């Protein structure tokens, strides 16, 4: 296999010259005649606001706001809150409302390159309507929908934007005003409410944006339905053969983001309105163009190209730089997993983002750093030293796992996962100042935890007892392979960090790491835990010692473990990450057929129509599973691409193999130097 590395920034845009197969357009996912009975929404997001599509025209199913949690109908722990729908629009022609049943030629399309969701339809013989909405990438709390109406006959339209306070919010107040001066008139439809316990205030504000000047724009009417609902609307007569365009702009923000969300929501809406549609779209597209400087291009497998780009799109959509936000397993695609942060971030989503966009990965690890004190408190109340990160984390950093799940008290490997991510960030970026200020406190505190967590046995070995494994079907077991492996790496990396910074680390860290128990069964296979015999497992565990931990490097051992545990994964009710690890390891073993088989098995059985969104399990109906996307992207980048985080710092390329039907794999914008890697047969 030939491998080429370019040190300059290289960006290649693969264009599809024909739309003969929508399913294989490298940048667009399309749905003709969306069927509400077989429809799983697509998400448009900017790392702060997520908008989930609806099969109904001019509607969205749900809006998700990152960073705001409260207790609501999901046990006694916090969760994302059902929020205001900013894009709740009604359109009528000559008094007849647009509905799914009275339109023709209905199509929806996600433009991944530009972060835009578009719907189009014909309303009887009167007009063709196209609408596109955006979670504006440069304005994290703002969205926009642009509507274009092309008339075939004279018609009069009525457009209404409805703000309804969801039942999850309390003590709502509704406001309407016109901001008027000599050159503009900006109508503001605003609602303010509190989360269920009153912990946070949420504010939303909408306005219409017209191409006409102040004197020609339609009159805006305000209507109060009841205490929970109000709307603004306008009428407009349009001549046959004309195109009429308008936009709806909205802002959504909470007291978790800023002290005064009510005023700031209105300020942001006014700002966006006066920026104007063209400037907003230009800035939005510039931001997406910048994101796509880091891309994956596949030649020879059009469907794989589209699917991989969809995975990139979703991870880019669910994250953003210069924040302390970190994605949940479902990203911003809904309320799944309560919006909590798990190990899914550090082990599955963080590595591809670290290589593609270190500045975004920095936000993910910043999330953990800001909650380090909470992790110290958890360690203390469980009788340990240092810092013990929660299995499920939200805004405070306290444990948020429902009490009926044993993972909250016993799945301790997440602490090592956080430390590993911190060290990887330093290796890729070489940011020594960050390492001193934030990386070292994380690595030191987590190493102190493991030093107090291990138990020395009669043989002088160190054991870690009574945990829930990465294979979560194994509860309250001793010496879980992956948990012990993360402890080893955590202690080793903390010692290395101390050396880099010229700090003296406790000698016991290295001594303990060298003697933590990793055992084998009589057949030579790495044993998942002390009481493991031959049970089925929920997900990869012992195999993770080969990657990402790289504690097992012998190829025969890696293959032995693969061939054993790949037979222990049931075909249903197991999460999508496992097969991605199998694919990655087979790529590095240069077994092309097995690598490609597990690559496809990692996500294709999990796809849902019409946009091929990924669910957590095979046949599942809970997309979008961004954890699975992160795993598959690692199979492509670190597996087929052979990219690897060098223990000495930076990114290197190890021996790997492409699928036989892939002619070429190009990975652009890697690391802080934005390198390009090209692989061919």
Swiss-Prot record:
Reactions that this protein is recorded to catalyse: kojibiose + H2O = beta-D-glucose + D-glucose
Annotated consequence of substituting residue 472 to Q: Loss of activity with kojibiose as substrate
SUPFAM superfamilies on file: Galactose mutarotase-like, Six-hairpin glycosidases
Keywords linked to the UniProt accession: Carbohydrate metabolism, Glycosidase, Hydrolase, Periplasm, Signal
GO cellular component: periplasmic space
Positions annotated to bind beta-D-glucose 2: 343-344, 538-539
Family named by the database record: Belongs to the glycosyl hydrolase 65 family.
Protein's UniProt name: Kojibiose hydrolase
Organism: Flavobacterium johnsoniae (strain ATCC 17061 / DSM 2064 / JCM 8514 / BCRC 14874 / CCUG 350202 / NBRC 14942 / NCIMB 11054 / UW101)
